[in-house]
Design a protein with these regions (language model features):
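A generic alpha-to-beta junction signature in SAM-dependent methyltransferases
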Residues: 123-125, 149, 222-223, 227
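C-terminal substrate-binding/active-site "lid" region of AdoMet-derived donor-dependent transferases
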Residues: 216-287, 292
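Conserved SAM-binding loop of SAM-dependent methyltransferases across substrates and taxa
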Residues: 138-151, 220-221
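Glycine-centered, small-residue-biased loops immediately flanking beta-strands
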Residues: 129, 153, 227
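N-terminal auxiliary segments of SAM/dcSAM-dependent transferases
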Residues: 1-94
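S-adenosyl-L-methionine
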Residues: 158-212
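C-terminal lobe and adjacent flexible extensions of AdoMet/dcAdoMet transferase-like proteins
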Residues: 3-6, 10, 17-26, 30-32, ...
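Conserved class I S-adenosyl-L-methionine
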Residues: 126-137
C-alpha cells in the first residue's frame, strides 16, 4: 500500500499548484504529460522526486529535446494541442484527502469535506471501530471512513447500485494504491443486506440515503448499545421525517440536528476580509445513539404546538415514493457514468502496470 510519503512513484495522484493557487490533480504515468493552460508538465520530471519541489512547464527548447529523445512519439504527440507558452511553475504535492475527494471522478454527487469532517467528529469515528455505511455514492465518505478507522478497524459499505459501487471501489483503490483490506463493499438494498449481518456488531452507522427513516429497524438490530447513528440528508422534509421516526421508535436518544456553513477569509497585510463566496447549505446531519434493549430513551416534555401534522401526512404511500424520486440527488446520465467508469478502469489498470514495472526494475538491479 502506498504510504503516501517518500519519493513519488508512477500511478500516484499528484496535485500541481501554480502561484495563483490554481490546482490540477492528475495521475502520473511513465512518459506521460499533464496538459495545462500554460504548457505541459512532463511526468518524468516528477516521478522519483519528493513532495514540495517545483516543476516548470515545457518550453519550445525542452519540447525539442523530448522529441529527440523519443522520436517514436512524433506521430502522436499529446502536447501538440497545448499552447506553447512554457516556463510556468507548479508546486508538486500529494493531494490532501479533502482535495482528492473534490477532484476524483464521480458517479454520484459527493458530500463536501466540511460535512464529512463533521460526520467523523460528531460520530466519534476513530481507529479500531467497526463502522457500517449505507450509500457509497462516489466513495467520498467511504475513503474518509477508511482513513478514520484505519487498518485496525473495519468498514462495511452497502450500496444499492452496482455501478456506483464500482466507482467508489475504484476511487478508494486509487487513493490507497491498492484496495483497502479492511473494507467490505456490498451491493443491494440496505434492509436485505443488513439482515445478514450479526446483531449488535457495529459501533457506528453512517446513513447517506433518501429515506433513512425506513431503515431504522435494521440499523437498531446491528448497532451496539450506545453506538452512534449519524445520517446525512439534504432537505427539511427528510430531516423532519427522520427525527420523528427516531423519537417514535423509542430506543434512540433525542436526535441532534446540525448544519455546517463554511466561509474562507483573505488576509493581505492589514486588509483582512471574508471571501465574497462561501459554501452554504449542503445538507443536515442528524445524530442519535442507541439505547440498550428493553430501555426507552428519556424525553423532555415539550409544550404542545398547533402544528402536529405536515403536508406529507396526507399523502398516499405511492405519492410519498414519488416525492422521494423527485429528491433523487444521485441521478447521472448513463453516458456520463460509462465515461467515469472507463476513466477509473484505465487509472486502476495503471496501478498494476506500474507495480509490475517496479518489481521488474528491482529484479534487474539484483
Amino acid at each position: 500500500m502506498n504510504p503516501r510519503r517518500g519519493p513519488i512513484v508512477a500511478g500516484e495522484k499528484i496535485q500541481f499548484t501554480d502561484r495563483k493557487g490554481k490546482k490540477i490533480t492528475d495521475q502520473l504515468t511513465a512518459g506521460g504529460v499533464t496538459q495545462t493552460e500554460h504548457g505541459i508538465i512532463l511526468h518524468d520530471d516528477v516521478i522519483g522526486r519528493t513532495e514540495g519541489v517545483v516543476v516548470t512547464t515545457v518550453t519550445a527548447k525542452r519540447e525539442a529535446q523530448v522529441n529527440a529523445d523519443h522520436p517514436e512519439r512524433d506521430r502522436n504527440k499529446p502536447w501538440k494541442a497545448t499552447r506553447a507558452i512554457g516556463g510556468w511553475q507548479y508546486a508538486v504535492m500529494r493531494p490532501r484527502l479533502a482535495d482528492y475527494v473534490l477532484s476524483m471522478p464521480r458517479g454520484a454527487q459527493i458530500m463536501y469535506p466540511k460535512d464529512i469532517a463533521q460526520v467523523i467528529q460528531l460520530g466519534d469515528i476513530r481507529s479500531g471501530l467497526n463502522v457500517l455505511e449505507s450509500g457509497a455514492g462516489s466513495g467520498a465518505m467511504s475513503v474518509n471512513l477508511l482513513d478514520a478507522v484505519g487498518e485496525s478497524g473495519h468498514l462495511t459499505t452497502i450500496e444499492l447500485r452496482p455501478e456506483f459501487a464500482r466507482v467508489a471501489d475504484a476511487n478508494a483503490t486509487l487513493y490507497y494504491g491498492e484496495r483497502p483490506r479492511w473494507w467490505d463493499l456490498k451491493t443491494g438494498d440496505f434492509d436485505s443486506v443488513a439482515a445478514g449481518l450479526p446483531e449488535h456488531s457495529f459501533d457506528r452507522i453512517v446513513l447517506d440515503m433518501l429515506d433513512p427513516w425506513n431503515r431504522l429497524e435494521q440499523a437498531y438490530r446491528v448497532i451496539a448499545p450506545g453506538g452512534v447513528l449519524i445520517a446525512y440528508i439534504t432537505t427539511t422534509t427528510q430531516m423532519s421525517r427522520l427525527v420523528e421516526a427516531l423519537r417514535e421508535a423509542g430506543h434512540w436518544t433525542e436526535p441532534a440536528i446540525q448544519e455546517t456553513l463554511e466561509r474562507t477569509w483573505k488576509a493581505q497585510g492589514l486588509a483582512v476580509r471574508p471571501d465574497h463566496a462561501m459554501i452554504g447549505h449542503t445538507g443536515f446531519l442528524v445524530v442519535s445513539r442507541a439505547m440498550a434493549e428493553g430501555f426507552a430513551a428519556l424525553r423532555k416534555r415539550d409544550r404542545a404546538t398547533k402544528d402536529t401534522t405536515t403536508d406529507i401526512d396526507s399523502l398516499t404511500p405511492e405519492q410519498r415514493e414519488a416525492q422521494l424520486d423527485d429528491l433523487e440527488l444521485r441521478d447521472i446520465s448513463d453516458h456520463k457514468l460509462r465515461k467515469v467508469l472507463r476513466d477509473l478502469d484505465l487509472q486502476t489498470s495503471r496501478l498494476s502496470q506500474d507495480d509490475q514495472a517496479c518489481k521488474q526494475g528491482e529484479a534487474t538491479a539484483i
